Amino acid sequence: MKFSYTLLLAFWVFSGWSQNEVSIYTERQGSDVIVYADNPAVIPMTAEIKLNLTNMKTDFGGDEGLFVIPQKAERHQLLSAKATRQVGKIGLGLESIIYIGDVLNQSETEHIYELPFASGMTYQISQGYNGRFSHKGVNAIDFAMDVGEKVYAARGGIVYRVVQKNSKSCQHSSCQEYNNYIMIYHDDGTFSEYSHLKYNGADVKVGDRVKTGDLIGFSGNTGWSSGPHLHFVVYKYDQKGNRQSLKTKFRTKDQGDTILQEQGSYTKE
């Protein structure tokens, strides 16, 4: 049997950003073509693959799909394709988009979060879900915390991203790039993000596995902010890489497990 093999196209782009670059590449094994991925990141990534096949058939029977790449994976096989004829030209064109996290994990389990501050403390919600200043269309919460107050993990997970180099702030969206924040990935595929931390205000690093209630940083007033506070949001990515913020319930001392309301004050047990 004699084949001529053509790799028609191979490139990858990223939805949002990633801590480390995911690599997708092919390898010829006889008349088969194997598609592999390397993922140096500390959390899983998802590859959306679209193929242009010439006289080839994939092991999953289609020409596009979503494939989860485990964290720290090297040479992880995504798919393979076989020739459908014994002689002649075969080819595999490949396009991919990389989404952060495991977007195939769409579990709807309701998790009760701990308030992200010290036990016995009480804070007011200065801006709630879909708030008028900077939360329009976003399920995020602002806790009215002064600069330098301790911030604790509301839920355990893996620290995916830490930014703490910024000191600038203003009341305009143009300052959003100056947010200091910590981003934590959870086992159900969701993320939690703690924003406006003070300069050098992180007490964790990328790759740390934190437990609920661990100290992770210190509140501040960086980025797009009208004053000192802690911005907290939980979100997931759908199967097209679109970010969806989620309403969450918190465990409180006096109101039980509840959704926090703007201007309400809540105490941690």
Q: For each predicted feature, which ranges?
A:
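Acidic, glycine-rich catalytic/binding loops that coordinate metals and/or anionic ligands
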Residues: 111-118, 126, 172, 202-211, ...
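C-terminal soluble interaction/assembly domains
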Residues: 215, 225-227, 241-244
